[in-house]
Amino acid sequence: MELNAGGVIAYISSSSSASSPASCHSEGSENSFQSSSSSVPSSPNSSNCDANGNPKNTDVSSIDGVLKSDRTDCPVKTGKPGAPGMTKSHSGMTKFSGMVLLCKVCGDVASGFHYGVHACEGCKGFFRRSIQQNIQYKKCLKNENCSIMRMNRNRCQQCRFKKCLSVGMSRDAVRFGRIPKREKQRMLIEMQSAMKTMMSTQFGGHLQSDTLAEPHEQSVPPAQEQLRPKPQLEQENIKSTPPPSDFAKEEVIGMVTRAHKDTFLYNQEHRENSSESMPPHRGERIPRNVEQYNLNHDHRGGGLHSHFPCSESQQHLSGQYKGRNMMHYPNGHTVCISNGHCVNFSSAYPQRVCDRIPVGGCSQTESRNSYLCSTGGRMHLVCPMSKSPYVDPQKSGHEIWEEFSMSFTPAVKEVVEFAKRIPGFRDLSQHDQVNLLKAGTFEVLMVRFASLFDAKERTVTFLSGKKYSVDDLHSMGAGDLLSSMFEFSEKLNGLQLSDEEMSLFTAVVLVSADRSGIENVNSVEALQETLIRALRTLIMKNHPNEASIFTKLLLKLPDLRSLNNMHSEELLAFKVHP
């Protein structure tokens, strides 16, 4: 069965056999995090089930659907082509092709698709009450390690609520309830119209003034700015609050773009391969004395590498630049370099590694992604992004997914370096910096490596260089997460963002004030707003007739959050059931 993106749930048969899971996808689970219950269940107009537990014909969805116009609603369809084999018995039991769907929280029989996952009535009501009443549960006496099952789900409410969040239940679905489809579409149109008006109001004069301003020009005083020719929205511009100076926004755009280019080595390789000539020392703007990002204290508590496992040799994040003679790669290989600065991959990136020379001895495909480092007569081949399709039949699905996770280890270091060079990021507290990186690294990698997903060939290229078809990966156990990642990448690639736009969007993804554990929310919000304004300015400058691109980019943020939750769930299952 073909899997679509988002909200795809792993289904377990009634025998609870771990060896025979099935993956399916209903219309109601499309694009993740839809609610199938109301925030006010006592209201007859806000519930999608009748007294017998059967679904009504009312087509409604959560407020999250307002952000995605292509979502559909009813979580359990009967007799419709979009959900073949999906039935719901008179007892409220949801089945798929004869298999009983279990609650993802406690394992009880699921009554439907509630708040983003299939759940039973008990867990649905528990989660709704927890969010609506903002209940602070008593601290767990077992270090929050209680196993939540049907028989004991009421013993530890803190662990039960934690389990609800970990499996993907959406807070927003409870907070906003459900909205009829027509109302959802109307709100979406109004939101897009308001966004377009806001951008036109704030930046109507910006496009004309760009040609008059030099890069080093200081900001123009408001009085002089109002004297310049403006479009028809002149009066509205004068009345509105003036945005930050264009010079400041251009400076932010330039700094973030340089940080993205300098710390995204995979993107550099593709730019170098696509151009016939390369300027000397392209992408080598990293300062010689880069202060290391010290996360050692956080590793002891399951820090960044708890999301991206790596070997012991890759966990040194506190080293400084030194004139070493060899570079350690994640696979254990070392590259000796003469008269160059290099360092362990888990430290900072070298300011100058070697002269990159295309390999003549490799195949045409490999030569575009392979480079030689000349070290006094010794030649070391480095092929980090070989495109040669290769599937090892001897490897199990677990080993392949472990390789997939391991291959991202150096990319995680790039995200850390990128974050350090975002204007204002280093001004945040160390605690907030670490929390933003821990929570947002996967989402940044998802944006950066969207090009690894080839929609035409239906393939995924691992960072180790191996290419797998989607069908092969599905046969190895990949399901909902891979399908969601593939669809997200296809949509993001369809926007055809420039390097500058991708850089700003990546920074916006990382700096999110609603991450858990943030201490100084106001500081993070201020930085986030600065980046969003810069992104809006850039989009309006590059696409004056396509204002919807900015809206579409912002709508990708909840998609990324959904993918992040799904990834955390898969990683947890990966650790518990290797």
Curated annotation (Swiss-Prot):
Residues 227-237 have a biased composition (Basic and acidic residues). Residues 1-99 are annotated as: Modulating. This is Nuclear receptor subfamily 1 group D member 2. GO terms for biological process: cell differentiation; circadian behavior; energy homeostasis; hormone-mediated signaling pathway; intracellular receptor signaling pathway; lipid homeostasis; negative regulation of DNA-templated transcription; negative regulation of inflammatory response. CDD domains: NR_DBD_REV_ERB, NR_LBD_REV_ERB. GO terms for cellular component: cytoplasm; nucleus. Its main location: nucleus. The modification N6-acetyllysine is found at residues 162-163. It comes from Rattus norvegicus.
